[in-house]
């Protein structure tokens, strides 16, 4: 699997993901890019789960973003509706984290859309480790969103065998 972390702090939203692709208990690739920009660079998206399924979801989500002129929440809700009603989509084994200047959302494998109240997203095999680390750093330090995302992913990578230290980071200003 993988680990994705997104943090909102000090006027920035940051999303970071590790690069490990595993097949069972075997590492197949260590430098996959699981965090990318969508919709003219205005949206950051990351995935955890089956890679081919995630690419299908990226395509569907980007189509919804285009259809709804980049409105993140509306596009996520419409994707979730499709996910629940389309039999081929309902079999996909992936989760998306999406963020822009207005919101950070998790789109789950059963078609739920969740906006965390604290602006922190951590998902995937190392998600619980990354979330605990990020939450502690948010509460007890003044580190930037980027530093928190990167540090929490490194901690998850030290603990979770399905998460490595080859990190991709995307950052966006919350204003403008």
Curated annotation (Swiss-Prot):
**Residues annotated for Na(+) binding in this entry:** 157, 160, 163
Q: Which GO terms describe its cellular component?
A: HslUV protease complex; proteasome core complex
Disulfide bond as a keyword of this entry, yes or no, is: no
- InterPro entries membership: ATP-dep_Prtase_HsIV_su, Ntn_hydrolases_N, Proteasome_sua/b, Proteasome_suB-type
Alphabetical list of NCBIfam families matching this protein: ATP_dep_HslV, PRK05456.1
Top-level class of the enzyme under EC nomenclature: hydrolase
List localization entries: Cytoplasm
Q: Which SUPFAM superfamilies match?
A: N-terminal nucleophile aminohydrolases (Ntn hydrolases)
The organism's place on the tree of life at top rank: Bacteria
Q: Which GO terms describe its biological process?
A: proteolysis involved in protein catabolic process
What is a GO molecular function of this protein? metal ion binding
Q: Which family does it belong to?
A: Belongs to the peptidase T1B family. HslV subfamily.
The UniProt catalytic activity note for this protein reads: ATP-dependent cleavage of peptide bonds with broad specificity
PROSITE patterns, sorted? PROTEASOME_BETA_2
Q: Which PANTHER family match?
A: ATP-DEPENDENT PROTEASE SUBUNIT HSLV (PTHR32194:SF0), METALLOPROTEASE TLDD (PTHR32194)
Per UniProt, the keywords (alphabetical) are:
Allosteric enzyme, Cytoplasm, Hydrolase, Metal-binding, Protease, Sodium, Stress response, Threonine protease
- So where's the catalytic machinery, residue-wise? 2
Q: What is its EC number?
A: 3.4.25.2
At the highest ranks, the source species' classification is: Bacteria, Pseudomonadati, Pseudomonadota, Gammaproteobacteria, Pseudomonadales
Protein task: Protease subunit of a proteasome-like degradation complex believed to be a general protein degrading machinery.
Binding partners and assembly: A double ring-shaped homohexamer of HslV is capped on each side by a ring-shaped HslU homohexamer. The assembly of the HslU/HslV complex is dependent on binding of ATP.
Q: How is its activity regulated?
A: Allosterically activated by HslU binding.
Give the protein's recorded name.
ATP-dependent protease subunit HslV
Task: Tell me the Pfam families matching this sequence.
Answer: Proteasome
Organism this protein belongs to: Pseudomonas savastanoi pv. phaseolicola (strain 1448A / Race 6)
